[in-house]
Design a protein with these regions (language model features):
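N-terminal signal-anchor transmembrane alpha helix
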Residues: 1-25
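Membrane-interface loop-to-helix entry segments
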Residues: 52-62, 109-124, 169-172, 176
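Terminal transmembrane helical module of multi-pass membrane proteins
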Residues: 130-199
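Interfacial/capping segments of alpha-helical transmembrane domains
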Residues: 21-35
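Interfacial helix-start motif at the membrane-water boundary
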Residues: 39-65
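Membrane-proximal helix-loop-helix units in multi-pass membrane proteins
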Residues: 89-130
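Transmembrane alpha-helical segments in integral membrane proteins
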Residues: 7-8, 60-80
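Hydrophobic cores of alpha-helical transmembrane segments in multi-pass inner/ER membrane proteins
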Residues: 59-69, 120-129, 176-190
Length: 199
């Protein structure tokens, strides 16, 4: 089950893009934040919001919970580094659930507080997971995704509140994890099969 939880993470990307396209108002993936998709629209002429905000908030909750559950095998390992990475994934996933439970239009301060750990823990989780727990091409790919996520998190902090490119920066911070997690899960599954002498 934990591995399946991570294998399904790219579904988050599909859900987010689909909801952006079906927002019912003018919404820009480049300029509007992800949280805006969880924000209800005051009128048909509103921008940077969604007519189906409940759906995006549900996506935050479901995929955040799956992300945390997928980290359970790491928490059970003896190596301290594996447990550190595991807890980073748990923190990022748990607070992602909080983002969905506290939409920015209903609870702006709480939303900001629960979103902040995601932008710290998740990029670090990708980068450290790749550097500490993988080798070869998987390590190279994960490191590239981790660096991109860190750059995105810093850029988003700088651009927060700007009229342009904040959505791009936020997605650069968040999306790499959704690409990395299935790769990490497959790597762990292969290692486990080898440990049991399976092909």
């Amino acid at each position: 089950v934990p591995y399946a939880a991570w294998l399904g993470q790219p579904g988050y990307l599909a859900a987010e893009v689909l909801l952006a396209l079906l927002a019912g108002v003018h919404y820009s993936l480049a300029d509007d934040t992800i949280s805006a998709l969880g924000t209800g629209c005051d009128s048909p002429t509103s921008t940077g919001c969604s007519s189906a905000s409940w759906a995006m908030n549900l996506v935050f909750v479901v995929f955040g919970a799956l992300q945390a559950v997928g980290a359970v095998p790491l928490l059970r390992q003896d190596a301290a580094r594996a447990r550190v990475v595991g807890w980073l994934w748990v923190v990022a996933g748990t607070f992602s659930v909080g983002v969905g439970l506290a939409p920015v239009d209903a609870h702006p301060t709480l939303h900001s507080l629960v979103a902040l750990p995601v932008f710290v823990a998740q990029p670090l989780a990708v980068l450290l997971h790749a550097r500490w727990l993988t080798t070869g091409r998987v390590r190279v790919s994960g490191t590239a995704l981790g660096v991109a996520a860190v750059v995105g998190a810093v850029a988003f902090a700088v651009l927060l509140g700007a009229d342009s490119w904040s959505g791009t920066a936020e997605r650069l911070a968040i999306w790499p994890a959704k690409l990395w997690l299935p790769l990490a899960a497959l790597t762990q599954l292969r290692s486990r099969r080898r440990a049991f002498g399976l092909p």
